[in-house]
UniProtKB/Swiss-Prot annotation:
It is found in: Secreted. It holds the Pfam family Toxin_12. It comes from Cyriopagopus hainanus. The lineage of its organism: Eukaryota, Metazoa, Ecdysozoa, Arthropoda, Chelicerata. This is U3-theraphotoxin-Hhn1r. SUPFAM superfamilies: omega toxin-like.
């Protein structure tokens, strides 16, 4: 199971293509 866009990544890893925001602790698109 993985965390999708804008989902919390405190306990789960983000789904493929997303990164965990260190500030907000949710999954976002990687910065260009």
């Amino acid at each position: 199971d993985c965390a999708g866009y804008m989902r919390e990544c405190k306990e789960k890893l983000c789904c493929s293509g997303y990164v965990c925001s260190s500030r907000w602790k949710w999954c976002v698109l990687p910065a260009p």
